[in-house]
A protein has these predicted regions:
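N-terminal glycine-rich "phosphate-gripper" loop used for MgATP/nucleotide binding
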Residues: 1-4
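A conserved helix-loop-beta module that forms one wall/lid of the active-site cleft
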Residues: 8, 12-74
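Internal nucleotide-binding/catalytic subdomain
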Residues: 56-173
């Protein structure tokens, strides 16, 4: 954003579009607008919001502070007591940023999509499937191409979601 403000031309996706994708609340709004199904989640800004979500949440949930890299301070918790314990232990890592809580889907498959977009058309180069079960941090996992266990419906859904998101976010690259 700072480079853009200084008049430096950046090729590819604009800093505004990147910020839109990185901002959890804005991204959630886009997901809802595009009618893309995702697990229940909460972007908790305070302890009260965490407790309120824990009353209605289906455990296990994946909790993590926003604005951290590499899976640091992420954890799967299985009940309200573990969630409260996590909040108190991770207070330093959160640095007054929201805590993200997502319903964790056990025995799920995780996929990565490589796609190119020119702002109008989307080309899916490949869909990779993680070898490990879906978990806390995908950055240290291994993938295979082509996927070893993906139905035609799941493939179609992934392509549809990727296309909708790339166009909505004005992805270029």
């Amino acid at each position: 954003e700072q480079l853009t403000n200084e008049g430096v031309k950046i090729f590819g996706t604009s800093s505004a579009s990147i910020d839109l994708a990185e901002n959890r609340e804005e991204f959630a709004r886009i997901i809802k607008k595009l009618k893309i199904q995702i697990p229940e989640y909460c972007i908790a800004k305070n302890y009260e919001e965490i407790i309120n979500f824990s009353e209605i949440a289906q455990f296990p949930v994946l909790v993590r502070p926003s604005y951290v890299l590499g899976g640091r301070a992420m954890q799967i918790v299985y009940n309200k007591e573990q969630l409260v314990d996590y909040v108190f232990r991770s207070a330093e890592a959160t640095n007054d940023h929201p805590i993200l809580i997502d319903q964790f889907i056990e025995n799920a498959f995780e996929f990565d999509v490589d796609a190119l977009c020119d702002g109008e058309e989307v080309f899916i180069a490949g869909i990779m499937q993680h070898i490990e079960e879906a978990g806390v941090h995908s950055g240290d996992s291994s993938c295979v191409l082509p996927p070893y266990d993906m139905s035609n419906k799941v493939k179609k859904d992934i392509i549809d979601m990727t296309t909708k998101l790339a166009i909505e976010l004005n992805v270029v690259g």
